[in-house]
């Protein structure tokens, strides 16, 4: 009986974090799409926090690149510069040289 309970606890311990990450990734995608719409409408003050939250939930390089572009458009050049540097570093590490080049 103890082994069964221990096995169930162990199984739940591996399943629950994966479920939480999937939910975070889905929420991040929704936020990213909304931010993209706002960015396209030049509503940078509304778009940038959504890009930031999307990146926090699912830290993908593309989300960080979008956030950097948003901060640049918003006039927050120091923030954008740091983010572009991070994008370039991460993109090169991921083998995405075209993205790294666009970030520089």
Where are these regions (language model features)?
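Bacterial N-terminal signal peptides
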Residues: 6-15
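Alpha-helical, heptad-rich or low-complexity scaffold/stalk segments
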Residues: 21-104
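Positively charged n-region of N-terminal signal peptides that target proteins for export
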Residues: 1-4
């Amino acid at each position: 009986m103890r082994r069964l309970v221990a096995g169930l606890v162990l199984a739940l311990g591996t399943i629950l974090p994966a479920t939480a990450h999937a939910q975070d990734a889905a929420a991040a995608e929704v936020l990213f799409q909304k931010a993209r719409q706002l960015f396209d409408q030049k509503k940078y003050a509304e778009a940038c926090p959504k890009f930031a939250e999307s990146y926090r939930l699912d830290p993908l390089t593309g989300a960080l690149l979008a956030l950097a572009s948003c901060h640049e458009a918003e006039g927050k050049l120091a923030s954008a510069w740091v983010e572009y540097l991070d994008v370039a570093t991460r993109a090169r590490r991921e083998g995405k040289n075209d993205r790294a080049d666009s970030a520089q």
